[in-house]
């Protein structure tokens, strides 16, 4: 058994399907291009973390040419997301990964400020006996969740995509008596106003 694995959840950057809340500002093609840049940035960071396997969990499926290119560039494993909602897809990924690894960190591709120090702190906390590590996002969600064993209650009946995801997750953690730690808060890119914080990632005039 290898020590740990990073699970990167990503959607194919298809115009009209990716970063839809940014389409009014960037247009379908521009939003898809930004999403592609975010996926590559995330994989750059994840694969730079020391001696940890990286799996790219793909939506709608891993057979898109974009994901094949990612596999060739980053030497990541490709997996298909499966489940009726985000929570079920995340839980299924953890269930599979934690049969082969001691711990797993699951991340999306919306957080440009995610860094190696976040991964190092999460790994340290899990190895020191913490049950769950969360990376809080400023919008009320989280950009990272780390586990040593699947915890179904953390992924069921959560209002995914809203501002209550993190608070609901903390409630579930407390109800289950799980120990948890929190990483530094970061901002996601989800809405046009978020682009102002990350001008290097978009050619759009956001001022």
Protein language model regions, located:
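Short acidic/His/Gly/Ser-rich catalytic and metal-binding motifs that mark active-site loops
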Residues: 14-20, 64-67, 142-144
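A short, N-terminal amphipathic alpha-helix
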Residues: 33-52
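Short beta-strand/loop segment that forms part of the nucleotide-sugar
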Residues: 52-60
